[in-house]
A protein has these predicted regions:
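Active-site phosphate/ATP/adenylate-binding loop shared across adenylate-forming ligases
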Residues: 7-29, 34, 38-318, 325-341, ...
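Glycine-rich, aromatic-lined ligand/substrate-binding cores of catalytic
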Residues: 349
Length: 351
């Protein structure tokens, strides 16, 4: 066995937490009343939530680079609190930005030093982690310009931050759809399975772009797929087995969607934008109608050309804009003026 594929002690510890804590999380699904109450709560507590985060994750955290930047700007907690009370959250962030309290992508990744006048330091990825969160699992950023960064996910707080998937499906009348995923193995798949399950959505198929039997696949990812299904069984939820489906030949997905449509139901595939396009191209090549099918496109921009192929196949698509660091930032608009228009999640984000 290749040494790089041997699970580490951290992997084994995460596996134990995974199997003991995830079933408990999955057993209690959202209700409509609960979701809308959580949304009202978070919209009404934006400033309070921000100040709580600033106090515990920044000012009480000696490793936080934002604490260093705030010190450089001459801001203590009470001043930030006063700014928020007087000017509101967005204007406070603009004021802090003008004072140099921000990180560029290059600075946050540690590729360039943070330089503000006489202040000069490097940021390590772990310096940006919230010390109050336990890393039950970790997701890795896309790493489009280098190796991705690990971002911890805490099951204890996961549920309170997962109701957005319910709202998206509810808005699209999609809670009763037959849902499927076509993604690469890893923690991002796991988090999406959890979000959909908490919404009470049925996951009918699990298509994977990487062969689970491949010798090149790290054991961590192979076992994570098994642990997810085992945790589901412990919670009374039966997750489907992963089905290896090559990018160039997604005919199995097309046939599944066709069978659901023939049964008078709605199939919904959650996948990367280029993969959705390939599914629609395959359907067109085989003369199979996807009228009534739904897609959620992630990971890549939804261009006019991509949307045109989806529409030509008879399907409809929405987008989901997210990052590993921030989770969901925006969901697709139901009446967009542009193909990639999203509704910004102001309950959890601010610009």
């Amino acid at each position: 066995m290749n040494a790089t594929r041997i699970p580490t002690l951290d992997d084994l510890t995460s596996a134990v937490r995974f199997l003991t804590q995830l079933p408990r999380l999955l057993r209690r699904t959202f209700t409509t009343e609960e979701v809308h109450a959580l949304l009202r709560r978070d919209l009404g507590r934006r400033e309070v939530n921000f100040l709580d985060l600033a106090r515990t994750a920044i000012f009480a955290n000696s490793k936080s680079p934002f604490r260093k930047l705030l010190h450089y700007a001459g801001c203590e907690y009470h001043e930030v609190e006063n700014l928020v009370r007087k000017k509101g959250l967005e204007e406070t962030l603009r004021e802090l930005y003008r004072r140099g309290v921000y990180l560029t992508v290059e600075e946050a990744k540690g590729r360039r030093p943070v330089i503000r006048d006489n202040t000069n330091f490097y940021v390590a990825p772990e310096d940006l982690r919230n010390p109050g969160l336990q890393a039950d699992i970790a997701v890795r950023t896309s790493g489009s310009r280098g190796r991705g960064t690990l971002v911890p996910i805490d099951f204890a707080s996961f549920r309170a931050n997962s109701y957005d998937a319910y709202l998206d499906l509810e808005t699209r009348c999609g809670l009763s759809w037959h849902h499927a995923f076509w993604l690469v193995p890893g923690s991002l798949v796991i988090t999406r399975f959890i979000r959909y399950t908490l919404s009470g959505a049925r996951i009918a198929r699990w298509f994977t772009l990487v062969d689970p039997g491949s010798a090149a696949l790290h054991l961590r990812y192979n076992w994570s797929m098994r642990f997810l299904r085992w945790a589901g069984l412990l919670a009374g939820v039966r997750f489907p087995r992963p089905i290896y489906t090559e990018f160039q030949n997604p005919i199995a997905i097309v046939h599944w969607m066709e069978s659901v449509l023939h049964a008078g139901e709605t199939p919904h595939l959650h996948s990367y934008a280029s993969c959705v396009v390939r599914v629609c191209e395959t359907a067109l090549e085989h003369g199979i109608s996807l009228v009534g099918a739904q897609f959620t496109m992630v990971g890549e921009p939804l261009t006019a050309a991509r949307l045109a192929i989806v529409q030509r196949a008879g399907a409809r698509a929405s987008i989901r804009y997210a990052s590993a660091e921030m989770s969901v930032v925006g969901f697709g608009c139901m009446a967009p003026q542009a193909t990639d228009e999203v509704h910004f999640m102001t309950d959890r984000c601010a610009v």
